[in-house]
């Protein structure tokens, strides 16, 4: 099984000017050195977050949980039967138990859902579940990393966001097309600019959804912040030629680079771009109070709060 070692984690933080660290990609609680790595990270001047199905939170002591700036729980459906069918029996209860525990400890909670064909019209309902814990809902669009079974059609993508934004208040949007159509200004940072993904295979990628194995960690050790000038990071920042004259260029940058790369169309506009189809949907948004959410700048995402 691929796993980063504690020494590799230390090396990454020594070579990069890190402000925040998210522990994602699978259940970190299954790593034999999870607690040792967490103990080290707690000594560093970084904002620490974790994404979990509940297991990695359940194995930690209360004092360890208090080290986190935010704890994310993966919940894709608003009912127990649907969630347990997708994630395994007992997952709904585990998430509710551990989210309630975090709230009791004063640790901020976020619910993270993937917008996909099976739930795209029901995410406002998931947001209402999140609100039971005083938590926002963070939404990532399904990316066809292994299969396109759950991938949204063009119409489903836009209908999903219209429904979601009609029933929730927006904390932040970094999903490029949605941000542009909501009339929000350009956002600094993002994939290929200010984030580095270090995989369990000890490789680096500019985006969590970037296809391929990634570049060996030795490249980061040699170049440090210079990793941002490597080929894959430059590709993640590339704006398609067809988008150069678009009025939304500075906000959208051609859409999600990871999605374009996955679809073998890095140099083409995002599949979900309405402008290329001669359309211009306007998304009406009502803003909520801002929150300090480090994950906002590390992926194309949307954060909302149920009304």
How should each PLM-predicted stretch be described?
Residues 27, 55-56, 116-117, 143-144, ...:
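Conserved beta-strand edge residues that scaffold enzyme active sites
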Residues 8-30, 270-307:
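Short Fe-S-cluster ligation motifs
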Residues 30, 58, 80-81, 255:
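Short glycine-rich, flexible loops that bind phosphorylated cofactors or substrates
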Residues 53, 63, 85-86, 210, ...:
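Residue-level signal for well-ordered alpha-helical positions
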Residues 1-67:
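Conserved alpha-helical substructure of the radical SAM core
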Residues 31, 58-60, 120, 147-148, ...:
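Short secondary-structure boundary/hinge segments and terminal tails
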Residues 4, 14, 35-39, 47, ...:
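Radical SAM enzyme [4Fe-4S]-AdoMet core and its adjacent flexible, acidic
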Residues 174-280:
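Accessory C-terminal segments flanking Radical SAM cores
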């Amino acid at each position: 099984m691929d796993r980063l070692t504690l020494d590799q984690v230390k090396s990454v933080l020594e070579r990069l000017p890190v402000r925040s660290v998210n522990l994602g990609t699978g259940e970190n609680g299954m790593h034999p050195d999870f607690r040792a790595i967490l103990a080290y990270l707690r000594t560093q001047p970084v904002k620490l977050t974790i994404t979990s199905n509940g297991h990695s939170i359940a194995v930690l002591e209360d004092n360890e949980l208090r080290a986190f700036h935010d704890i994310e729980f993966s919940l894709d459906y608003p009912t127990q039967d649907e969630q347990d069918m997708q994630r395994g029996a007992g997952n709904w209860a585990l998430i509710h138990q551990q989210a309630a525990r975090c709230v009791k400890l004063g640790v901020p909670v976020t619910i993270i859902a993937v917008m996909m064909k099976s739930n795209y019209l029901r995410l406002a309902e998931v947001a209402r579940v999140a609100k039971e814990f005083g938590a926002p809902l963070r939404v990532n669009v399904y990316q066809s990393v292994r299969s396109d079974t759950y991938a949204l059609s063009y119409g489903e993508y836009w209908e999903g966001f219209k429904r979601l934004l009609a029933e929730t208040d927006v904390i932040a949007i970094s999903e490029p097309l949605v941000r542009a159509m909501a009339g929000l200004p350009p956002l600094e940072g993002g994939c290929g600019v200010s984030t580095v993904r270090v995989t369990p295979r000890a490789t680096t990628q500019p985006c969590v959804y970037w296809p391929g194995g990634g570049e060996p960690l030795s490249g980061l050790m040699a170049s440090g912040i210079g990793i941002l000038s490597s080929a894959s990071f430059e590709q993640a920042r590339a704006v398609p030629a067809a988008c150069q004259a678009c009025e939304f260029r500075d906000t959208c940058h051609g859409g999600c680079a990871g999605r374009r790369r996955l679809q073998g169309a890095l140099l083409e506009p995002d599949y979900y771009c309405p402008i290329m189809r001669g359309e211009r949907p306007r998304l009406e948004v009502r803003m909520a109070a801002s929150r300090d959410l480090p994950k906002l700048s590390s992926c194309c995402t949307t954060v909302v709060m149920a009304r």
